[in-house]
């Protein structure tokens, strides 16, 4: 059973404020939730395999391959307007000033 003092402690930790008459209500509600959890804890799950995924698909793995290709030109092809060539030369994006 969750006591009023425990509910008050939880509300303080969660930075919530309840009126005094609501504390008793939450005490009984939290107690019923804990009772449901205790019922689940009593279930024997020794022969149940842990569920890691809801589907049995395997991830396709590929070998890691190191490449030394410079992708910056392809990246800076996305820059719009006249600043595209400058962005390719200096290898960074040029943006309008946003902080005064």
UniProtKB/Swiss-Prot annotation:
EC number of the protein: 6.3.5.-
Any Pfam family the entry gives: GatC
Keywords: ATP-binding, Ligase, Nucleotide-binding, Protein biosynthesis
Any single biological process term in GO: regulation of translational fidelity
GO MF assignments: asparaginyl-tRNA synthase (glutamine-hydrolyzing) activity; ATP binding; glutaminyl-tRNA synthase (glutamine-hydrolyzing) activity
Reactions the enzyme catalyzes: L-glutamyl-tRNA(Gln) + L-glutamine + ATP + H2O = L-glutaminyl-tRNA(Gln) + L-glutamate + ADP + phosphate + H(+); L-aspartyl-tRNA(Asn) + L-glutamine + ATP + H2O = L-asparaginyl-tRNA(Asn) + L-glutamate + ADP + phosphate + 2 H(+)
Domain of life: Bacteria
Assigned protein family: Belongs to the GatC family.
Role noted for this protein: Allows the formation of correctly charged Asn-tRNA(Asn) or Gln-tRNA(Gln) through the transamidation of misacylated Asp-tRNA(Asn) or Glu-tRNA(Gln) in organisms which lack either or both of asparaginyl-tRNA or glutaminyl-tRNA synthetases. The reaction takes place in the presence of glutamine and ATP through an activated phospho-Asp-tRNA(Asn) or phospho-Glu-tRNA(Gln).
Subunit structure: Heterotrimer of A, B and C subunits.
Name the UniProt record assigns to this protein: Aspartyl/glutamyl-tRNA(Asn/Gln) amidotransferase subunit C
Underlying gene: gatC
């Amino acid at each position: 059973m969750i006591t009023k003092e425990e509910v008050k402690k939880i509300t303080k930790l969660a930075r919530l404020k309840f009126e005094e008459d609501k504390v008793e209500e939450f005490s009984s509600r939290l107690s019923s939730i804990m009772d449901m959890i205790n019922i689940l804890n009593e279930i024997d799950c020794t022969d149940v395999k842990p569920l890691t995924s809801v589907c049995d698909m395997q991830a396709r793995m590929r070998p890691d391959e190191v490449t030394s290709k410079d992708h910056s030109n392809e990246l800076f092809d996305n820059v719009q307007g006249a600043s595209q060539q400058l962005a390719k030369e200096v290898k960074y994006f040029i943006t309008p000033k946003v902080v005064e």
